[in-house]
Swiss-Prot record:
It comes from Bacillus thuringiensis subsp. konkukian (strain 97-27). Catalyzes the transfer of a ribosyl phosphate group from 5-phosphoribose 1-diphosphate to orotate, leading to the formation of orotidine monophosphate (OMP). Its EC number is 2.4.2.10. InterPro entries: OPRT, Or_phspho_trans_dom, PRibTrfase_dom, PRTase-like. Its cofactor is Mg(2+). This is Orotate phosphoribosyltransferase. Pfam families: Pribosyltran. PANTHER family: OROTATE PHOSPHORIBOSYLTRANSFERASE (PTHR19278), URIDINE 5'-MONOPHOSPHATE SYNTHASE (PTHR19278:SF9). One of its GO terms (biological process) is pyrimidine nucleobase biosynthetic process. Homodimer. CDD domains: PRTases_typeI. Coiled coil: none annotated. The keyword RNA-binding does not apply. One of its GO terms (molecular function) is magnesium ion binding.
Length: 210
């Protein structure tokens, strides 16, 4: 499953690997990878494979789920498809409460005591997913965990999720993606080394000259 999804993401350009010409993230950090899972919305076969995979993860790890919650905005569509497949209620969670109307942060019903699974598109440092989890917990929901399309497997993300006491499972990850990219001839040994070094310590730009 991990390599299949990784292959899909590479084929449609949802993930770019540029170890020799790094991207600059909004945080200012240099990165050899850029992920835009919103592109999956435009490819029916890919998004169907993702929805099926997320459903499988949820049934395996969180079988008692009662509500599917999407993170705004990238997780909303995938949460909708998954909730439809599972015939479950769905809601989505904003990064912060609206400044007008009812001032909702959670849109749709997520009632006190309900068991919720969060659908996220990407786990980087885990910040947006944890914000979603905290909002649901404040509303009295029991958050069973998070499922996502892809994770960078960063230690910072793992630590934040552990600190928030929330389980997280992804369809694919950085390790599988780099392996598939190498198998497809998209990167060579030198590029693979840079990618491996970046993941060990993203904040240390020494990987650029590795």
């Amino acid at each position: 499953m991990k390599k299949e999804i990784a292959s899909h993401l590479l084929e449609i350009g949802a993930v770019f690997l540029q170890p020799n010409d790094p991207f600059t993230w909004s945080s200012g950090m240099k990165s050899p990878i850029y992920c835009d899972n919103r592109l999956t919305l435009s490819y029916p076969k890919v998004r169907q494979a993702i929805a099926a995979g997320l459903e499988e993860l949820i049934k395996e790890h969180f079988p008692t789920v009662e509500v599917i919650a999407g993170t705004a905005t990238a997780g909303i569509a995938h949460a909708a498809w998954v909730s439809d497949r599972m015939d479950l209620p769905m809601c989505y969670v904003r990064s912060k409460a609206k400044g007008h109307g009812k001032g909702n942060q959670i849109e749709g019903k997520a009632e006190k005591g309900q068991k919720v699974v969060v659908v996220e598109d990407l786990i980087s440092t885990g910040g947006s997913a944890i914000t979603c989890v905290e909002a649901l917990r404040e509303a009295g929901c029991e958050v069973l965990g998070i499922v996502s399309i892809f994770t960078y497997e960063l230690e910072a993300g793992k630590e934040k999720l552990e600190a928030a006491n929330v389980a997280s499972y992804s369809l694919s990850d950085y390790s599988a993606l780099t392996e598939v990219a190498a198998e497809k001839g998209m990167i060579g040994q030198a590029e693979t080394k840079k990618l491996q070094e970046w993941r060990k310590n993203p904040a240390n730009e020494a990987w650029i000259t590795a």
